[in-house]
From Swiss-Prot:
Record keywords: Glycoprotein, Lysosome, Membrane, Transmembrane, Transmembrane helix
Positions in the Lumenal compartment: 1-48, 105-120, 189-205, 268-300
Species per Swiss-Prot/TrEMBL record: Homo sapiens (Human)
Entry function: Lysosomal integral membrane protein that may regulate MTORC1 complex translocation to lysosomes.
Protein name: Integral membrane protein GPR137C
Glycosylation sites: 285
Membership in a protein family: Belongs to the GPR137 family.
Underlying gene: GPR137C
Ranges of biased composition (kind: Low complexity): 1-17
C-alpha cells in the first residue's frame, strides 16, 4: 500500500495502492490498473458520495449565512466572537462546497483523492490547505470566548490585564499556523527532491498539529474552570447558552480535533521511510505527480465515516453553539435581577417609589404577589386607603390625635382625577 503523505490539516482518506500516471491523467499504467481491479469503487458511487458531502457543506453554508443575517436583524454586535466564528465557518463551508462540487467536472471522481494536475498553486492551496487554517482560527476563537466568560464572571481586574496578552498569543498562533501552512505548500508545489518533500511534510505536521493539541489542552482548562463557577451558568443563559451546551460542544471539539492531530503525527512519523500508511491522511496531494486511486468498497465507506466525524461534526457543533438567538430581556427568572429592582419604566420627576425605604421592600414584594387586597389598609402614617369605590378611611396617627399641621397624602390609585383639591386635607375653621 503506497500513498503520498500530504498536509496536516484534514481528515483521513483510505487508499490501497497507487500507480503513477501521466500528468493529464489519461491513458497510462494507472488507468490500466484501475480498469483491471475488480474491487475498485464505481464512478457512480464516488459521485454519490461527493454529492452527499457537497450537500452537507452547502447546508452548513446556508445555515451559517442565515445566522449572520439574524444577528443583523436582532441588532447584535457586528464584531464579536459569535459573528467571527460564524463568518469563519461560512467561509470554510464555502471552500469545502466548491471543492466537492468539482466532482462533476472530474467525471465523478472524488476531488480529494484525485486533484487536477493543471491546478495552479494558489487555487490548490486555497481549496485544499486554507480550510485547515480556518478550523484552527475557529478553535482559537472558542478559547478566547471561554476566557472572556471567565473574566466576566469573576470580574477580576488582574484577568482583564492579561486579556490583551491572551489575544496576542492566539493571534500569533493563528499567524504561525498560516505561515507554516503556506510556506510548506509553496516548497512542495515546486520541484523538490523526495527527501526534502518528506522533511517538509514532517515539519509542517509537527508544528501545525502541535498547535492544535495545545489549543485543545487550553480549551480543556477553560472548561474545567467554568464548571467550577456557580455563576457561569447565569451569564451563559443571559447570552442564550447554557453550561451544559458549553461543556458538550467543547468536549466534542477537543476530542475530534486532538484525535485528528494525534493521528496525523503518528502517520507522518511512521511513514517517513516507506511512505506507507493505512489511510491517505490529508486533503492535499503534495506530490507533483498525478495519481489514480484504486480504492476498495470498505475503505471508501471508512473514508466517508472519518470525513463525517472529523469535518462535519465539529463544524456543525460550533455553528449551533454560536447561533443567533433573540435574548430574553426579562432576566429576573434567571437571577440576573434581584427582588429589590424596580420596573423598567423610566421616571423623570414622579417616580412613585422614590421615598421607599428598605423596610418597605418586603411589603412592596408581597403587594406584587397579590397578598394584599385592594380593600386592605397599609397603615402608613397619614395615608387614606379606599375600602370601596367611593369610601375612604383615614388612618389615625400612631402617637395620638392628628395635629392641624400635618397634611394627609392620598395614595389610593382610584381617586377621581377631577377632584384635584382633595389630595391634601387641611384644617377647616
Amino acid at each position: 500500500m503506497r500513498v503520498s503523505v500530504p498536509g496536516p490539516a484534514a481528515a483521513a482518506a483510505p487508499a490501497a495502492g497507487r500507480e503513477p500516471s501521466t500528468p493529464g491523467g489519461g491513458s497510462g499504467g494507472g488507468g490500466a490498473v484501475a480498469a483491471a481491479s475488480g474491487a475498485a469503487v464505481p464512478g457512480s458511487v464516488q459521485l454519490a458520495l461527493s454529492v452527499l458531502h457537497a450537500l452537507l457543506y452547502a447546508a452548513l453554508f446556508a445555515f451559517a449565512y442565515l445566522q449572520l443575517w439574524r444577528l443583523l436583524l436582532y441588532r447584535e454586535r457586528r464584531l464579536s466572537y459569535q459573528s467571527l466564528c460564524l463568518f469563519l465557518c461560512l467561509l470554510w463551508a464555502a471552500l469545502r462546497t466548491t471543492l466537492f462540487s468539482a466532482a462533476f467536472s472530474l467525471s465523478g471522481s472524488l476531488p480529494l483523492l484525485r486533484p487536477p494536475a493543471h491546478l495552479h498553486f494558489f487555487p490548490h492551496w486555497l481549496l485544499y490547505c486554507f480550510p485547515s487554517c480556518l478550523q484552527f482560527s475557529t478553535l482559537c476563537l472558542l478559547n478566547l470566548y471561554l476566557a472572556e466568560v471567565i473574566c466576566k464572571v469573576r470580574c477580576a481586574t488582574e484577568l482583564d490585564r492579561h486579556k490583551i496578552l491572551l489575544h496576542l498569543g492566539f493571534i500569533m498562533a493563528s499567524l504561525l499556523f498560516l505561515v507554516v501552512n503556506l510556506t510548506c505548500a509553496m516548497l512542495v508545489h515546486g520541484d523538490v527532491p523526495e527527501n526534502q518533500l518528506k522533511w517538509t511534510v514532517f515539519v509542517r505536521a509537527l508544528i501545525n498539529d502541535s498547535l492544535f493539541i495545545l489549543c485543545a489542552i487550553s480549551l480543556v482548562c477553560y472548561i474545567c474552570k467554568i464548571t467550577k463557577m456557580s455563576s457561569a451558568n447565569v451569564y451563559l443563559e443571559s447570552k442564550g447558552m447554557s453550561l451544559c451546551q458549553t461543556v458538550v460542544v467543547g468536549s466534542v471539539v477537543i476530542l475530534l480535533y486532538s484525535s485528528r492531530a494525534c493521528y496525523n503525527l503518528v502517520v507522518v512519523t511512521i511513514s517517513q521511510d516507506t511512505l506507507e500508511s493505512p489511510f491517505n491522511y490529508g486533503w492535499d496531494n503534495l506530490s507533483d505527480k498525478a495519481h489514480v486511486e484504486d480504492i476498495s468498497g470498505e475503505e471508501y465507506i471508512v473514508f466517508g465515516m472519518v470525513l463525517f466525524l472529523w469535518e462535519h461534526v465539529p463544524a456543525w457543533s460550533v455553528v449551533l453553539f454560536f447561533r443567533a438567538q433573540r435574548l430574553n430581556q426579562n432576566l429576573a427568572p434567571a437571577g440576573m435581577i434581584n427582588s429589590h429592582s424596580y420596573s423598567s419604566r423610566a421616571y423623570f420627576f414622579d417616580n412613585p417609589r422614590r421615598y421607599d425605604s428598605d423596610d418597605d421592600l418586603p411589603r412592596l414584594g408581597s403587594s406584587r404577589e397579590g397578598s394584599l387586597p385592594n380593600s386592605q389598609s397599609l397603615g402608613w402614617y397619614g395615608t387614606m386607603t379606599g375600602c370601596g369605590s367611593s369610601s375612604y378611611t383615614v388612618t389615625p396617627h400612631l402617637n395620638g390625635p392628628m395635629t392641624d399641621t400635618a397634611p394627609l397624602l392620598f395614595t389610593c390609585s382610584n381617586l377621581d382625577l377631577n377632584n384635584h383639591h382633595s389630595l391634601y386635607v387641611t384644617p377647616q375653621n
